[in-house]
Amino acid sequence: MEPKETLRQRWPGRGRTEETGAMKKSDDAPAVMTVEHLNMYYGSFMALKDVSMVIRKNRITALIGPSGCGKSTFIRSLNRMHEIVPGARVEGRVTLDGEDIYAPEVDPVRVRRRVGMVFQKPNPFPTMSIYDNVIAGLKLGRKRKKSELDEIVERTLRQAALWDEVKNKLSESGTSLSGGQQQRLCIARTLALEPEVILMDEPASALDPVSTQKIEDAMLELKEQYTVVIVTHNMQQAARVSDYTGFFFIEDMGQPGQLWEFGETEKIFSNPDRKETEDYVTGRFG
């Protein structure tokens, strides 16, 4: 195993430094979501096996691991988005503020409002303006005054680090924006619903370095008010922005994905407990 200092130098963190409000050595942030012994199936195929995890409030949790190990499947279980796939089902328990999100009386639409999702590929509504893209989800609820909608649009675009770039062209199509701007527009659209948790499935994988930096900066700002869970293949990104990291792994092709190791990001990247974790974060496979 490499010396600890070498691993730390390889993965300098940005999200946990004193300048950004460091995480305490003993984190006392409350749990906002708890996953207990989660198994997930698509038909008869077991995609995830026995995953347990605590997701803490106002923290960024990164999910890493090789392709096909269940990261995106897992993140979709956190707001029941996987249920749009025929034959998908879960065993185990997932709670949000102590409430089982899979309880029979729980409306999955309500879960998805409380746990928002930003997908890998930006997906602004092509027939809508930038303004209308932001408030699209609000149109399904109570009627709001124009002044209230204006405030929501400005606030969420500021939170997504996009306001200054679009404030003079809110009536233009959302698809007129660059890829990075479109992704930040999708973040603003998610924020307009005032979720407690924001899920991001490789939100910067298709973006250039400048756009990626803006997404990361936005994430670090967002965790002051929200809890963020991000799937990423970018080890530098996970090390820079996250407080906690979960490493997913499959032992062999056709086997279910498992949460191989979970803990504070500093430890996962500098002194992991399992050899497979070290091999992955140091680039020996994956």
Curated annotation (Swiss-Prot):
It catalyses: phosphate(out) + ATP + H2O = ADP + 2 phosphate(in) + H(+). Residues 33-281 form the ABC transporter domain. GO terms for biological process: phosphate ion transmembrane transport. Keywords: ATP-binding, Cell membrane, Membrane, Nucleotide-binding, Phosphate transport, Translocase, Transport. It is found in: Cell membrane. Its main location: membrane. Residues 15-27 have a biased composition (Basic and acidic residues). InterPro entries: AAA+_ATPase, ABC_transporter-like_ATP-bd, ABC_transporter-like_CS, P-loop_NTPase, PstB-like. It is a peripheral membrane protein. ATP binds at residues 65-72. Its EC number is 7.3.2.1. The keyword Transport applies. SUPFAM superfamilies: P-loop containing nucleoside triphosphate hydrolases. GO terms for molecular function: ATP binding; ATP hydrolysis activity; ATPase-coupled phosphate ion transmembrane transporter activity. The complex is composed of two ATP-binding proteins (PstB), two transmembrane proteins (PstC and PstA) and a solute-binding protein (PstS). Part of the ABC transporter complex PstSACB involved in phosphate import. Responsible for energy coupling to the transport system. Belongs to the ABC transporter superfamily. Phosphate importer (TC 3.A.1.7) family. This is Phosphate import ATP-binding protein PstB. It comes from Rubrobacter xylanophilus (strain DSM 9941 / JCM 11954 / NBRC 16129 / PRD-1). The gene is pstB.
